[in-house]
Swiss-Prot record:
Subunit architecture: Homodimer which binds Holliday junction (HJ) DNA. The HJ becomes 2-fold symmetrical on binding to RuvC with unstacked arms; it has a different conformation from HJ DNA in complex with RuvA. In the full resolvosome a probable DNA-RuvA(4)-RuvB(12)-RuvC(2) complex forms which resolves the HJ.
PROSITE patterns given in the database record: RUVC (PS01321)
Species: Chlamydia trachomatis serovar A (strain ATCC VR-571B / DSM 19440 / HAR-13)
Cofactor mode of binding and number, as noted: Binds 2 Mg(2+) ion per subunit.
Binding site for Mg(2+) 2: 70
Active site (catalytic residues): 9, 70, 145
Alphabetized UniProt keyword annotations: Cytoplasm, DNA damage, DNA recombination, DNA repair, DNA-binding, Endonuclease, Hydrolase, Magnesium, Metal-binding, Nuclease
Location (main, coarse): cytoplasm
Single GO MF annotation: crossover junction DNA endonuclease activity
Name by which UniProt lists this protein: Crossover junction endodeoxyribonuclease RuvC
Top EC class of this enzyme: hydrolase
Function of the molecule: The RuvA-RuvB-RuvC complex processes Holliday junction (HJ) DNA during genetic recombination and DNA repair. Endonuclease that resolves HJ intermediates. Cleaves cruciform DNA by making single-stranded nicks across the HJ at symmetrical positions within the homologous arms, yielding a 5'-phosphate and a 3'-hydroxyl group; requires a central core of homology in the junction. The consensus cleavage sequence is 5'-(A/T)TT(C/G)-3'. Cleavage occurs on the 3'-side of the TT dinucleotide at the point of strand exchange.
């Protein structure tokens, strides 16, 4: 039995998503991935509507066991923080309306799970995720958001396995 975990790297212009298949608790394989591209010409409310609609469709089609997002962090520009927070809210709503549990991890936790160090660059995450999952397409410059989404999903898979193993040892 395989479980699907969906990682989402939220954004107000580009939102990367990636689904991994976890088989027998230990084997992780890429399932599907992509980007939701939001037009800068659209009003913010219409971008959020498009994001909600497209992610909701993917959730319905794929039926993941979990959705994984980055925790909110503060940008230098307060407006960017607010807009990203609203995009995260849209994603939380899309998942909760379909009864998919949402898990959140700090960016450095996801980077550590994928690369081995929490302060890894986006390029390092991209390279390592591409190698670990054998997805050469991730190395394209505009696929950083997808690589981050894969890293989030992998982080959750690893931490869930760790929690399961801890339970068996107690």
């Amino acid at each position: 039995m395989a479980d699907l975990i969906m990682g989402i790297d939220p954004g107000t212009l580009v939102c990367g998503y990636a689904l991994i298949k976890v088989e027998n608790r230990y084997h992780i394989h890429p399932h599907s991935f992509g980007k939701v591209k939001l037009s800068q010409k659209l009003a913010l409310a219409h971008r959020y509507k498009q994001l909600f609609t497209e992610i909701s469709t993917i959730l319905q089609q794929e039926s993941p066991k979990a959705v994984v997002l980055e925790t909110q962090y503060v940008h230098k520009n307060p407006q960017s923080t607010i807009k990203l927070g609203m995009a995260r809210g849209v994603l939380l709503l899309a998942a909760s309306l379909q009864d998919v549990p949402v898990f959140e991890y700090a960016p450095n936790t996801a980077k550590k799970a994928a690369v081995g160090k929490g302060n890894a660059s986006k390029k390092q995450v991209q390279l390592m995720v591409s190698k670990l999952l054998r997805v050469p397409d991730l190395l394209a410059e505009d696929n950083e958001d997808i690589a981050d989404a894969f890293a989030l999903a992998m982080c959750h898979a690893h931490l869930a396995l760790y929690q399961d193993l801890k339970k068996t040892l107690v």
